A protein has these predicted regions:
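Exposed beta-sheet edge/beta-hairpin loop segments within beta-rich domains
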Residues: 117-121, 133-135
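C-terminal charged interaction modules
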Residues: 128-132
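Central antiparallel beta-sheet cores of small beta-barrel/beta-sandwich binding domains
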Residues: 24, 30-32, 36-116, 149, ...
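N-terminal helix-cap/turn-to-beta initiation motif at the start of protein domains
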Residues: 17-26, 153-155
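Edge beta-strand at a domain terminus
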Residues: 133-158
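Sec-dependent N-terminal signal peptides
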Residues: 3-14
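Residue-level recognition of beta-strand termini and adjacent short loop/turns
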Residues: 123-125
């Protein structure tokens, strides 16, 4: 009987691990303007963060220099470069829903605004990122796709 219980516990634990997909890795945004690397914020934390690691257009056409956070409401931060900028932070795994992270924020350098955000890994290569003000119902979702360093962002089609 004890063996049977151990077997059920081991298989049950293995199944719960299999249901948790890894969010860590490189993601391209829906508009393909950027690649974001998502990983743990620190080794001691379960929180995840995202950093801008590639831009389709890294040079500001007005200045001829690397793009900066020029729309940030904090004037002291307007000179920081977009490459290397943390734009996702504070996400914790949802205890009730596997592959879902809540409690975080997303920063939009295109608007200079920070929004509440939740993230759902719908399959190993698809991430639903929902930014909102107040409650998720009043938000907007984007679908991000897992990518590689070598995969190019599509040219601007606007």
């Amino acid at each position: 009987m004890k063996r049977l219980l151990v077997v059920f516990c081991v298989f049950g634990f293995s199944a719960s691990i299999a249901n948790e997909m890894s969010i860590n890795g490189l993601w391209k945004t829906q508009d393909q303007r950027a690649k974001i690397e998502i990983q743990s914020c620190s080794q001691a934390s379960q929180e995840i963060c995202g950093v801008i690691v590639e831009l389709r257009e890294p040079i500001d056409p007005e200045t001829g220099k690397e793009k900066t956070d020029k729309l940030n409401p904090d004037e002291r931060r307007r000179g920081r470069k977009l490459l290397g900028l943390v734009n996702l932070s504070g996400f914790k795994p949802d205890a009730d829903e596997p592959n879902h992270w809540t409690g975080g924020t997303i920063y939009s350098p295109r608007e200079g605004k920070t929004y509440s955000c939740e993230i759902t890994l719908t399959d190993p290569n698809t991430l639903e990122v929902r930014g909102y003000v107040g409650i998720p119902l009043f938000g907007e979702s984007q679908i991000w796709t897992r990518t590689t360093k070598d995969e190019k962002l599509l040219p601007n089609s606007e």
